[in-house]
Amino acid sequence: MSSKLYIKTFGCQMNEYDSAKMADILLSEKNMELTEVPEEADLILFNTCSVREKAQEKVFHDLGRVRHLKNSKPDLLIGVGGCVASQEGSEIVRRAPFVDLVFGPQTLHRLPELIDARRRTGQSQVDITFPEIEKFDRLPPARTTGATAFVSIMEGCSKYCSFCVVPYTRGEEVSRPLDDVLTEVAGLVIQGVKEVTLLGQNVNAYYDKTSGEGDIDFATLLDYIHEIPGLVRIRYTTSHPREFTARLIETYQRLPKLVGHVHLPIQSGSDRILAAMKRGYTIIEYKSIIRKLRTIRPNISISSDFIVGFPGETDTDFEETMKLIDDVKFDESFSFIYSPRPGTPASDLPDDTPYRIKLARLHQLQEKIQRNAQMISQSMVDTIQRVLVEGPSKKDPNEFCGRTDNNRVVNFAGHAGLVGSFVDIKITAVSSHTLRGEISDMQ
């Protein structure tokens, strides 16, 4: 008889991918099936994120909410994975002795062994080491039932931006071998996947020196993936401006499966702040990348990340960020007020900007980008867009939704037989964050 697994995932798409891999390996080796009800679970896992402030406290809050379940189910195991686990390690067990397992992003493949050790010894198990590529070598083949899938091609970060905790929680950059990536993508396509999103903390830093084909950079990897029969679309996230090479830009000219959307975090429009962040590029260099991309694909959609209120940010610095938004015409952003992360260089910088000013700046920035997004969406009304139908709409379960090439979500009337296929949708209206449409050829 199978036992039940409950996973709560926080943070980025990489964590979503990792959670799916946890489920795969525990099904394969422990015959565990997923449940959405924690009370049913024999194993509860929290896959955590430490990018934002107070992430640790949120984890302990969630742990407190499930602690009582052990009273009625003494054999229940509770585990904490992800970046908070990497950052806090044994401190989690010290503060919450009822936690049985603590494991980092690079050791999730050892979950079956950690479970066995916990049951055998009665002691909490902590493993937050950084084995190089062992994680991917140990994972079972990917399983999916949808038309889209994530594929992790590299992990970690070697940039050490002054504000960022990722190098300390995910380790240095490590790329998967070319053959492993191609095998996973091809296997997903056989299962019905039409679109893959390639994942990495700095996905375009991918570099495989082990291939028999010679050194493989990210642009070359895209060339190989593009040749896989049955795959229709390729996305990737998150890219870094420092590795957005001329070769990568050229792929948008020769690879039609590469979608017309790029998420390219800038963080600030001020060269002074970018230098303090240790980002390694200037505004002119960033805008040059965008200009070259739009020369090849004039309608390409550009989204970004912004940090508002970084230590020392002046009104002038913020005005430069707003000007950059006007110049580039970003149509989506993930934007936050700076929050110091323990152990990062920026956490030691003096920060005398009042919170109310930071909050006002954030609202101004988000409103400007939302206006840009609305203008771009409005320009799509009455056009025909090719949409991959992903499933029922989140807004109305009687309708369906899918994504355009430029990453817009479209809601429309349809039927279940369309899921997993491409349909031509005429865009009829725009809402705050999505489009409405109708099937143009009544497929």
From Swiss-Prot:
GO cellular component, one term: cytosol
Reactions catalysed, as given in the entry: N(6)-dimethylallyladenosine(37) in tRNA + (sulfur carrier)-SH + AH2 + 2 S-adenosyl-L-methionine = 2-methylsulfanyl-N(6)-dimethylallyladenosine(37) in tRNA + (sulfur carrier)-H + 5'-deoxyadenosine + L-methionine + A + S-adenosyl-L-homocysteine + 2 H(+)
Cofactor comment: Binds 2 [4Fe-4S] clusters. One cluster is coordinated with 3 cysteines and an exchangeable S-adenosyl-L-methionine.
Xref: Gene3D superfamilies: Methylthiotransferase, N-terminal domain, tm_1862 like domain
Compartments (UniProt record): Cytoplasm
Residue ranges occupied by any TRAM domain in the UniProt entry: 378-441
Keywords: 4Fe-4S, Cytoplasm, Iron, Iron-sulfur, Metal-binding, S-adenosyl-L-methionine, Transferase, tRNA processing
Domain Radical SAM core: 143-377
Pfam families: Radical_SAM (PF04055), TRAM (PF01938), UPF0004 (PF00919)
InterPro entries in alphabetical order: Elp3/MiaA/NifB-like_rSAM, Methylthiotransferase, Methylthiotransferase_CS, Methylthiotransferase_N, Methylthiotransferase_N_sf, MiaB_methiolase, rSAM, rSAM_horseshoe
Domain called MTTase N-terminal: residue spans: 3-120
Entry cofactors: [4Fe-4S] cluster
Alphabetized CDD domains for the sequence: Radical_SAM (cd01335)
Positions with a binding annotation for [4Fe-4S] cluster 1: 12, 49, 83
SMART domains: Elp3
Highest taxon listed in the record's lineage: Bacteria
Molecular function per GO: 4 iron, 4 sulfur cluster binding; metal ion binding; N6-isopentenyladenosine methylthiotransferase activity
EC numbers on record: 2.8.4.3
Binding positions for [4Fe-4S] cluster 2 per the UniProt entry: 157, 161, 164
Family per similarity comment: Belongs to the methylthiotransferase family. MiaB subfamily.
Assembly and oligomerization: Monomer.
Role description: Catalyzes the methylthiolation of N6-(dimethylallyl)adenosine (i(6)A), leading to the formation of 2-methylthio-N6-(dimethylallyl)adenosine (ms(2)i(6)A) at position 37 in tRNAs that read codons beginning with uridine.
Protein name: tRNA-2-methylthio-N(6)-dimethylallyladenosine synthase
Organism of this sequence: Nitrosomonas eutropha (strain DSM 101675 / C91 / Nm57)
Gene that produces this protein: miaB
